[in-house]
Amino acid sequence: RRSSAASDVYKRQGDNCLFMISSHIAHDCIIGNNVIIANNVPLGGHVTIEDSVVIGGNSAVQQFTRIGRLAMIGGMTGVLKDVIPFGLSIGNRNYLQGLNLIGLRRQKYDNQKIMGLDKAFKDIFASKNLHENLSKINGEYKDNELVGEVIKFIEKDKKRPICSPLS
């Protein structure tokens, strides 16, 4: 077990994960709990996948990409941009189709919280300037921990592109 020279992390995998045939996890990846990676999915180096993520078959995840908690990646998706928590991403150059509403309901989140997240999703992606949009909604959703998690994810790494809806 060796890691790349710039890092002291090799691979960290959570509990209760399913890696189907021919999936590949490269060096320095961090995988959360309850992750499902379908057939023929390679993860590039330094990828971070948070808890309860599902990645559909024949998708590929580019190096240094982050995929937020409870996100779902459709089959045959090329993941080049970070996917927000609870996001539903598809396409050969991934874009956000919307939110993983079924996953949120299965996790038994309150409908009011889910509806608040859906409204915040529209506000966050109202224009191409995410950080300007975030400053406009500052404090509006402070009682919704789902929205807080999405905002924290976006603000954590401002160098990486965030997957957004097609306009």
Over which residues does each language-model region extend?
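Left-handed beta-helix
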Residues: G14-D15, M20-I21, A26-H27, G32-N33, ...
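Single conserved hydrophobic/aromatic residue that forms the stacking wall/gate
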Residues: R1-A6, Y10
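N-terminal alpha-helical segment
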Residues: R2, L18, I36, V54, ...
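Terminal amphipathic alpha-helical/low-complexity segments used for targeting or macromolecular assembly
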Residues: N92-S167
